[in-house]
Amino acid sequence: MMKQMMAVLALAGALLTACNNHESNNQKQQNMSETLNLTQTWDKTFPQSAKVDHRKVTFHNRYGITLAADMYTPKNASGKLPALAVSGPFGAVKEQSSGLYAQHMAERGFLTIAFDPSYTGESSGEPRRTASPDINTEDFLAAVDFLSVQDNVDAERIGIIGICGFGGMAVNAAALDPRIKATVASTMYDMSKVNVEGYFKSEDTPEQRMEKRKALAAQRTEDYKNGSYKRAGGVVDPLPDDAPWFVKDYHAYYKTKRGYHERSGNSNDGWNVTGCQSFMNQPLLCWAHEIESPVLLVHGEKAHSRYFSEYAFERMTGVHVEGESKKVGNKQLLIIPGASHVDLYDDVAGVIPYDTLEQFFKENLK
């Protein structure tokens, strides 16, 4: 009887220790994260789904910046789930495209988070509206940190989705972190490439780059004198008559009821002028050729930005492609016929290939 009593006490002690350790770990995570003032009302640019549960969460990156996210969980889910971290477009917030993707994928059985990158939206970080190829790649890695310790997530089945400029960040994250088992980049921008070369290499001479560097250096001096950062302005509004068609597409999303959000830089006064300076000297896709995990690049046939995905595909596979879908090993480029860049931001055109995304992740997160 005494032996049985001792065994029960030992088991109770072990359970209490495990419980205390779990609570201690949770408290440590909370202590490392800043308390954010998060909006609790549904303020997305898309309707809430009855098929998923939603709540706000926060987590921190290794620079001490606390990131705000929306978590979407399939209703009545049980056991450990495959998980996805979603972010983008560049200059958007989680209430826009990334949240839409995250909610759709949660309807299909994944636990998902859509997060605001550092310095934007409801996430912390000063100065506001600045970007970094390092820190914004780190944001994805921090999301993986967070997901990997959730009780209802299988840490061996975590993937990421990057949209627009965060497509490039997602590919960079996949090259850096083997915990990421599968990656989707949708309507991708390579923010390093566009900053250093301009669109279609229109600013790709040493002289043009030097002029950019001089302008950014002068703006830094001016900002320091003023004690504030000059904003570049968001999407042009009102539109000039001669605006390129892709700028009109951006306007139709960011500046109208369709996609406007009060915390979105693109919907309002944009990034700091100097906010993207470091992209000029830090190319995102340097090590894309060493990515071992599966990557799916999705792009519209008519998108002005299609060449970014084609370039990324070539960096990963060594195969040059123009305007057609292609698969080499576990790397795939999917071209959506007739689709523009912004068509992949929301469901208005009905061309986001959710079935393909579901199949891709279910095949590779197992």
Q: What residue ranges belong to the model's regions?
A:
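N-terminal cap/lid segment of alpha/beta-hydrolase-fold proteins
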Residues: 34-79
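The serine-hydrolase catalytic nucleophile loop
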Residues: 91-103, 117
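Alpha/beta-hydrolase-fold enzymes
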Residues: 171-255
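Catalytic nucleophile-loop/oxyanion-hole region of alpha/beta-hydrolase
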Residues: 94, 120-155, 159, 347-353
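Catalytic active-site module of serine/aspartate enzymes centered on a nucleophile-bearing elbow/loop
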Residues: 337-366
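Short beta-strand/loop motif that positions the catalytic acidic residue
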Residues: 291, 297-299
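Conserved alpha/beta-hydrolase
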Residues: 104-124
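Short beta-strand element of the alpha/beta-hydrolase
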Residues: 79-89
